[in-house]
Amino acid sequence: MRLDRFDRSFQLALSDAQSIAIGKDNQFIEPVHVMYTFLKEKKYKSIRNLLIHAGSNVDQLYKSVEQVCNDLPRVESVDGDREVQCSHALVKILNLCDKLAQKYHSNIIFSEVFIIAALQSQDVLSILLKKSGIVKELLEKLVQYEQSNYSIHDDSFKNRTQILEQFTVDITSLAEQNNLDPVIGRDEEIRRTIQVLQRRTKNNPVLIGNPGVGKTAIVEGLAQRIINKEVPEGLKNSRILSLDIAALLAGTKYRGEFEERFKKVLYAVSKDNNTILFIDELHVMVGAGKTDGSMDASNMIKPKLARGELHCVGATTLDEYSRYIEKDAALERRFQKIFIIEPNIENTIAILRGLKERYELHHNVHITDPAIVAAATLSNRYISDRQLPDKAIDLIDEAASSIRIQIDSKPEDLDRLDRRIIQLKLECQALKKESDELSKKRLEILSMELSQKEQEYSVLESEWKRERSSLFDIQNIKSDLEKAKTILDQSRRIGDLAQMSELQYGRIPELEKKLFNAIQSSNKKMRLLRNYVSEVEIAEVLSKWTGIPISRILANEKNKLLNMETILHQLVIGQDEAVRVISNAIRRSRSGLSDPKRPIGSFMFLGPTGVGKTELCKALSQFLFDTDNAMVRIDMSEFMEKHSVSKLLGAPPGYIGYESGAYLTESIRRRPYSIVLLDEIEKAHLDVFNILLQVLDDGRLTDNQGRMVDFNNTVIIMTSNLGSDLIQKKFDISDYDTMKKTVLNVVNQYFRPEFINRIDEIVVFHPLSIKHLIDIANIQLKYLYSRLEERGYPRTGITNKALLFLSKIGFDPIYGARPLKRIIQQYIENPLSQKILSDDLLPGRSITIDVQNDNIVFIQNDVIDDKDIYIN
């Protein structure tokens, strides 16, 4: 027996078999050790595939061989000096391998020959091979073909297998090992795919759909059905290989190297009628590997697709299919389109329930059913630029991840105690150096507190560790249950009824009962940790994604909506009609009565300057989103020229800036829940109004990239100063009705009827009176009070007399409240800053703003007790 004649794979297998024999304390290397190595290690996958093609039930054979290996006699070695040698049976089989290689006129002994030699021997391995259902004649033909063609061709069975292992991923093998997520629903799409695959010609389906709808999942579902024998006879022995295009391209240094690799893959796939090639992102094939004058990958697969030699399934998106595949008519006609639509909310919930166990096992948390329903409904409502079920799955995944981080981190109560203990220890160390009585007394008090805190910490820490241990026990039980279910599926496939019975009626019910008891026990005892995902965590994650306040997502704002006018009036003074109109629109939207295909509301604010048009927009942004930053403010004076209109939607193709995002559409794509303020709308070019017609009517807009932008969750507010010149010249500012009629006439003359008719409400703001200005001044001064408080001046206030004095000086019916801000700066902020810098006003004491002899004065007191004072 010459080992140098064995191929590299066979030599490695013999070395691995020797290691297994040593590990199991066996005295000799037996043939079953070699077979166990072939079946166990992934690097010998070609042997496994050979056995499958020869009709062997590989799973059953593996279990039988493993059992025989475990039952072999053991001879334990204390010092490890015993040498393991080949048994007489193995030597006979190896000699027979040499004889068979000579019969096939081969100078090299391949590992595949070992199977024939083992089958012809009288060893126990021969019995196991025959029991597995192997067909001897078919095996000999396959090996003979391998041996006879090796020296001449490079396309032998073994080399084909190695090429496929290098450049593809076996999806059916992943399904067999239970490494794929379960595919729930999608029965119609999978059935349609099977139907196309069974056709005589054009049996190559291409799955087309938006990103995230589950195209790849359908192929995985098909692989699972193949493993479970739930497909027609023509597909029962098939396997699905996913093409790894990155592996094909990686390391291709020279021209033609990619084409050579790809041609080998195509040849290997076409030689096996039971192999289906899956090309994810099919559009990548168009242009892949193409250099000057050479063919790309798509042109290489066309002939094989046309002749029916290649069984192929593709997947791509709608946009990329139209951009790449449809342009090549010859390539398009060789595929049969299957459109994958987005599942509805009910189907998404079913999908999430099916995936629930996998995510629970991964994160070691419990995902409640309300969380699943919330993930499907909220993602559908608030995330408009992605598809179900992908966005709902991501919500569940991230929410479960946040709970897992909390479990792994130290609880807040424990962390607070830990920091307090460190602080007390530092103080005690410092006080030990002092010798006065006060320090000693303080040290005694701190030592008692430290002892108490350490005791509390010890109790809490032990409880935290116990709760964590309980959660990890649950995870281990879930993991064991998952493994048991996987083995049950494998036993069902190979028909091992004894093991099926043991698992189905013994092991699995026992683990399920154990899991139920562990969960019930942990729920009663949990105080520091929380191991379940609820709709609150889903809403928190969604709030971080979209910037929408969590209270709004969870619909906890009913009282807030009912009192919306009161809240807005705290910031906007004297505009009851405008506040009422805005509040009604928001309430209609929240109650679900408004048209879902239009913006929440579209308004035009008219009136003289300085009456609160822009301020109302800021107040609305604060009310809806708890921030002023949720407002997209566009100054329409920047769009007076015709060429500047393209900035709203983006530059057309061929122009500089085509790739960069548009101002309006890009802002809404990134933050779909916002207020769009179109300031001074009358200054915009007429083409801007043509764009706005579609937004106001349909709630959507298409940008220069062809992407649909959804405006259904925006509030569109346009402000205008139309008619303000007439107001200043002809009318008494207090005559509101006349002023409103005049302004509306001007608006109707300026804007086209189709634009006016699409606006929900046109609001003419009321002019401000001296009473309104007093309230506005008080609001403005509150911002000053907060800044003073930060500088160390608490409880700043102003007298009624001083407030009236400022309001009278700042009152101008033509300019509204804008002059008031300048008056506050001039009369209060400027002199106040001088006094602070000159130390006339000391920190830590209150400041009262008063008026004496028509001059503002600042009085500093320890306590303010004047009832005639506005206090922050």
Swiss-Prot record:
GO annotation (BP), single: protein refolding
GO molecular function: ATP binding; ATP hydrolysis activity
Region feature (Linker): 343-547
Protein family: Belongs to the ClpA/ClpB family.
PANTHER family per record: ATP-DEPENDENT CLP PROTEASE, HEAT SHOCK PROTEIN 104
Binding site for ATP 2: G607, P608, T609, G610, V611, G612, K613, T614
Domain of life of the native organism: Bacteria
Protein function: Part of a stress-induced multi-chaperone system, it is involved in the recovery of the cell from heat-induced damage, in cooperation with DnaK, DnaJ and GrpE. Acts before DnaK, in the processing of protein aggregates. Protein binding stimulates the ATPase activity; ATP hydrolysis unfolds the denatured protein aggregates, which probably helps expose new hydrophobic binding sites on the surface of ClpB-bound aggregates, contributing to the solubilization and refolding of denatured protein aggregates by DnaK.
Clp R domain mapped to chain residues: 3-149
SUPFAM superfamilies (UniProt xref): Double Clp-N motif, P-loop containing nucleoside triphosphate hydrolases
Major localization class: cytoplasm
Intracellular or extracellular location(s): Cytoplasm
Name listed for the protein in its UniProt record: Chaperone protein ClpB
Region of interest (Repeat 1), residue spans: 6-72
Subunit (UniProt): Homohexamer. The oligomerization is ATP-dependent.
Cellular compartments per GO CC: cytoplasm
Region of interest: NBD2: 557-767
C-terminal: annotated segments: 768-872
Stretches assigned to coiled coil: 393-525
Region called Repeat 2, residue ranges: 86-149
InterPro entries assigned to the protein according to its UniProt record, in alphabetical order: AAA+_ATPase, ATPase_AAA_core, Chaperonin_ClpB, Clp_ATPase_C, Clp_N_dom_sf, Clp_R_dom, ClpA/B, ClpA/B_CS1
Positions bound to ATP 1: G209, N210, P211, G212, V213, G214, K215, T216
Source organism: Blochmanniella floridana
Domain comment quoted from the record: The Clp repeat (R) domain probably functions as a substrate-discriminating domain, recruiting aggregated proteins to the ClpB hexamer and/or stabilizing bound proteins. The NBD2 domain is responsible for oligomerization, whereas the NBD1 domain stabilizes the hexamer probably in an ATP-dependent manner. The movement of the coiled-coil domain is essential for ClpB ability to rescue proteins from an aggregated state, probably by pulling apart large aggregated proteins, which are bound between the coiled-coils motifs of adjacent ClpB subunits in the functional hexamer.
Keyword terms, alphabetized: ATP-binding, Chaperone, Coiled coil, Cytoplasm, Nucleotide-binding, Repeat, Stress response
